[in-house]
């Protein structure tokens, strides 16, 4: 079933066109990776889905509803959570309190139920339970990434947008983060991610889209992308930039 369908998506900033008629589909239960060089439009795609890009055109349909042009708050309520690059946690709040902020759109849910769900998030992510009362300024980069993803999941999204979840992390921590991404899909959440590490991204993704200068270059299963000589040479030889 198509959960997200993008047709002819355009986005423009002052410097010019960032997205130039992008088509993209995400089926329910998938992990889909957006790959490509720096400035290709990957992060802008996630921001456009989330209602964070003002000058957009085309069509973005989520669960059969047109969402392009809606406010971010309305998009979150429909079931889309966006974990941006840089994590953007509140350093003066504890791990637990940062996670609970992810449920700010669920005002009708009782506090006791939200606390129970926060407990589930703390148990789901390695190491977070013992850190629940620690302030986020004291965490490592990997721990902060886990908190950011847990906060996104507190919104109970059908679609989780992850923008460069491995940014600035050591290789062993990156592997841990992507094991969590696989587990997130296994618990029923669809994932669309932007990633600079093609090896790791395609190890968990069902399909990938390679963008170039704001347009789709090629898409396919990981094995299809790896077997494409042009794509492999240009973008998948380690994919040093995003």
What are these regions (language model features)?
Residues 135-139:
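Conserved ABC ATPase signature
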């Amino acid at each position: 079933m198509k959960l997200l369908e993008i047709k002819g998506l355009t986005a423009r900033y002052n410097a010019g066109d960032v997205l130039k008629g992008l088509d993209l589909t995400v089926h329910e239960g998938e992990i889909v990776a957006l790959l490509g060089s720096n400035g290709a439009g990957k992060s802008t795609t996630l921001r456009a889905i989330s209602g964070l890009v003002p000058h957009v055109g085309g069509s973005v349909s989520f669960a059969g509803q047109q969402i392009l042009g809606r406010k971010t708050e309305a998009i979150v309520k429909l079931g889309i959570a966006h974990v941006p690059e840089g994590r953007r946690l509140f350093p003066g709040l504890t791990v637990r309190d940062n996670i609970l902020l992810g449920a700010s759109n669920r005002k009708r849910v009782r506090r006791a139920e939200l606390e129970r769900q926060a407990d589930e998030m703390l148990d789901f992510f390695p190491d977070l339970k013992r850190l629940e009362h620690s302030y986020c300024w004291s965490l490592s980069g990997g721990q902060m990434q886990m908190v950011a993803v847990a906060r996104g999941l507190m919104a109970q999204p059908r679609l989780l947008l992850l923008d460069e979840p491995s940014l600035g992390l050591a290789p062993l921590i990156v592997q841990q983060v992507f094991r969590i991404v696989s587990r997130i899909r296994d618990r029923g959440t669809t994932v669309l991610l932007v990633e600079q590490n093609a090896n790791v991204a395609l190890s968990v993704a069902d399909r990938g889209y390679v963008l170039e200068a704001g347009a789709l270059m090629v898409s396919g299963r990981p094995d299809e992308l790896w077997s494409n000589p042009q794509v492999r040479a240009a973008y998948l030889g380690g994919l040093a930039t995003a």
